[in-house]
Amino acid sequence: MSKIGKHPVAIPAGVTASVDGQTVKVKGPKGALEVVLVEEIQASLEGGELKIAMRGETPRHKSMWGMSRTLVANLVEGVTKGFEKKLEINGVGYKAAVAGKNLQLSLGYSHDVIYPIPEGIQIAAPKPTELVVTGINKQQVGQVAAEIREFRGPEPYKGKGVKYAGEFIFRKEGKKK
């Protein structure tokens, strides 16, 4: 029995959900999303709740059950609240600015890094050293944040680079004479 998979996903007011074979579609105030579930899993809409069930009892069925339920729950949360990831930029002269549909990053290279903002994602720079990535698709928000962090990940000696807000960077001591 999956601890996560056995719980139904509640559909809040203002959100509509539909199940068409293996496809679960959810529409809400922030937009619409859909996910195609694997063959081992079936979804059903019962009384304002989405229930996820296994089609068999193999270990693969059990492992896909909890994951599929979480994917559907993320759809519902995305179209109601949305998701956000905060990034911090540390380093002398390191900064970020949003220019139209591009993110311009100055990260200590001889050139500025230009990152085109994907469709469905919003990036805000409340301060030159802070970025907020928001959207309704949890996977896409996390992917964009990871791609931005990858341009100049935090280094362990001075802590310079792009890191997630609240992320702990293990610091190393420099060479001793």
From Swiss-Prot:
InterPro entries (UniProt xref): Ribosomal_uL6-like, Ribosomal_uL6-like_a/b-dom_sf, Ribosomal_uL6_a/b-dom, Ribosomal_uL6_bac-type, Ribosomal_uL6_CS
GO MF terms held by the record: rRNA binding; structural constituent of ribosome
Recorded superkingdom: Bacteria
Keyword RNA-binding: yes
Role played: This protein binds to the 23S rRNA, and is important in its secondary structure. It is located near the subunit interface in the base of the L7/L12 stalk, and near the tRNA binding site of the peptidyltransferase center.
Subunit architecture: Part of the 50S ribosomal subunit.
GO cellular component: cytosolic large ribosomal subunit
UniProt keyword terms in alphabetical order: Ribonucleoprotein, Ribosomal protein, RNA-binding, rRNA-binding
Phylogenetic classification of the source organism: Bacteria, Pseudomonadati, Pseudomonadota, Alphaproteobacteria, Hyphomicrobiales
Pfam families from the UniProt entry: Ribosomal_L6
Family: Belongs to the universal ribosomal protein uL6 family.
GO terms, biological process: cytoplasmic translation
Protein name in UniProt: Large ribosomal subunit protein uL6
